[in-house]
Amino acid sequence: MAEIAVEVVYALPERQALLRLSVPAGTSAREAVLLSGIAEAFPGLDVQGCPLGIFGKLLARPEERVLETGERVEIYRPLIADPKEVRKQRAARARSEREGG
């Protein structure tokens, strides 16, 4: 069976990893993460259940998404802060600064 070249990436604030590997054609995004062995470098990483994406787009079903040559599978972490709440806080600060502080 033919092999394709893909990348698997994961980043923490203090450390990042980009792994290039060859996988059999027909490999899913989840399978590529498992084959990469990235869990060995990041012991707390749940490779079975973590959200995955390709080039910044979240995959609804990474177990079913078959990879193409050159694609980068991204492993996503949970958000530290709720984006809506951060925007509200930023708007409130800006409003109070406009009103004189």
Curated annotation (Swiss-Prot):
The UniProt entry, under InterPro entries, shows: Mopterin_synth/thiamin_S_b, RnfH, RnfH_sf
Q: Which Gene3D superfamilies match?
A: RnfH-like
The protein's matches in Pfam families, at most eight in alphabetical order, are given as:
Ub-RnfH
HAMAP family recorded for this chain?
A: UPF0125_RnfH
User: Which family does the record assign?
Assistant: Belongs to the UPF0125 (RnfH) family.
Write the protein's name: Protein RnfH
| Species of provenance | Pseudomonas aeruginosa (strain UCBPP-PA14)
Q: Gene symbol?
A: rnfH
